[in-house]
Amino acid sequence: MAEAATRSVGKVTQVIGAVVDVAFEGELPAILNALETDNNGNRLVLEVAQHLGENEVRTIAMDSSEGLVRGQQVIDTGAPISVPVGDETLGRIMNVIGEPVDEAGPLNTAHKRAIHQDAPAYVEQSTEAQILVTGIKVVDLLAPYAKGGKIGLFGGAGVGKTVLIMELINNVAKAHGGYSVFAGVGERTREGNDLYHEMIESGVNKHGGGEGSKAALVYGQMNEPPGARARVALTGLTVAEHFRDQGQDVLFFVDNIFRFTQAGSEVSALLGRIPSAVGYQPTLATDMGQMQERITTTTTGSITSVQAIYVPADDLTDPAPATSFAHLDATTVLSRSIAEKGIYPAVDPLDSTSRMLDPMVVGEEHYEVARKVQSTLQRYKALQDIIAILGMDELSEEDKLAVARARKIERFLSQPFFVAEVFTGSPGKLVALEDTIKGFKGLVNGEYDNLPEAAFYMVGSMDEAIEKAKKLAAA
């Protein structure tokens, strides 16, 4: 703390859990400035939230405030919280204030960046509607992701959210040469640890951030104070913005965006603000908007964000998920009933939506094929009760054909993943958009009515399905 001579120095006057009040003799630090103090040998960062008058500021602690005492010295850093950014962050885990927490040594980067930034000006943003090809058939065909867009990922426990996220990280690195940033916001520490090790096992990252790592991890888990959970998404976003400004197409994952709102609500209550609807903070829409508006495509690069969304009590009208929905361009819904059939990725082709599925954006052919696929699957869904009660024999010939095609489509929507290769033994497949459209076009037009259902399960392109059918016939 030798720099104390040149910076404003204050004293702790009150500690109430995560809220710490600090009094300054001279100039008061600006709102959102980071203050630092030494808490039993550990650096504790406090973020200024309010000016109380009487030369006092109210701050939110980014770590546990246990051990702080009144009268303790606090130094104003003169700037917001700044975190390391750059290629050195790949394969590493850091916390909300940019400190490495993976026991793999210090994180030395050439650049640091403040976590509070303005959204890019409108003139810097790219207005062209483009889709981000993921190489995953069901996503690219039925609910394509917008480059620089926001995607909501819905799904219960154990339906394959993590595997889908890892495959997206892998495919974006392969197809676009882009990096990914994963922000773990208020989720289980065990899951964060599992994800880190699974990424190393599946080759997405190298141990200790070695050469070839494709993703940076930023964690503020459930056990952290609300200040850390409310800011960790911004830390992850700051790392992603640096890659975008280097000309990259970046994938930014947030798991879970609801916890960002929840932490904001806790902080708001601690600061004494009057709560709004359902007890949420009155600044809910502003907090969400400030973060989401930073996720966009600029003339240099793009940040495409995939956000897992927890829906409290399955109530879609709850203010937290409802505020998130306003920002989404696409939704990917994972379904347990599809996972139970053994079809992975278990993306629900009828519930998942995208505003990019528009003939003006994806083209007439893609749009027509996608709509035909959905109508065939919808018809099958409508007939399922009849089949369950009366059996297939009672259906008309036309309906029997529709059911047979729908079952083939269902299986063709599955595909082997690169990141699951180590568990399944099947080599992963990255399918080009043209091959996806061509394959499904043939299916809905009846060109492959002669092939068995099994030929379409867990293959990449239609050529592989035809090969598989030949092998099945020969067996």
From Swiss-Prot:
A GO CC annotation given for this chain: plasma membrane
Positions of ATP binding: G155, G156, A157, G158, V159, G160, K161, T162
Pfam family of the protein (one): ATP-synt_ab
Membrane topology note: Peripheral membrane protein
Subcellular location: Cell inner membrane
Molecular functions (GO terms): ATP binding; ATP hydrolysis activity; proton-transporting ATP synthase activity, rotational mechanism
Catalytic activity: ATP + H2O + 4 H(+)(in) = ADP + phosphate + 5 H(+)(out)
The UniProt record lists the keyword Cytoplasm: no
Keyword Transport included in the entry's annotation: yes
The protein's Enzyme Commission number: 7.1.2.2
Key words of the record: ATP synthesis, ATP-binding, Cell inner membrane, Cell membrane, CF(1), Hydrogen ion transport, Ion transport, Membrane, Nucleotide-binding, Translocase, Transport
Quaternary structure (record): F-type ATPases have 2 components, CF(1) - the catalytic core - and CF(0) - the membrane proton channel. CF(1) has five subunits: alpha(3), beta(3), gamma(1), delta(1), epsilon(1). CF(0) has three main subunits: a(1), b(2) and c(9-12). The alpha and beta chains form an alternating ring which encloses part of the gamma chain. CF(1) is attached to CF(0) by a central stalk formed by the gamma and epsilon chains, while a peripheral stalk is formed by the delta and b chains.
HAMAP family: ATP_synth_beta_bact (MF_01347)
Family affiliation: Belongs to the ATPase alpha/beta chains family.
Function: Produces ATP from ADP in the presence of a proton gradient across the membrane. The catalytic sites are hosted primarily by the beta subunits.
Name used for this protein in its record: ATP synthase subunit beta
Organism: Rhizobium etli (strain ATCC 51251 / DSM 11541 / JCM 21823 / NBRC 15573 / CFN 42)
Source lineage: Bacteria, Pseudomonadati, Pseudomonadota, Alphaproteobacteria, Hyphomicrobiales
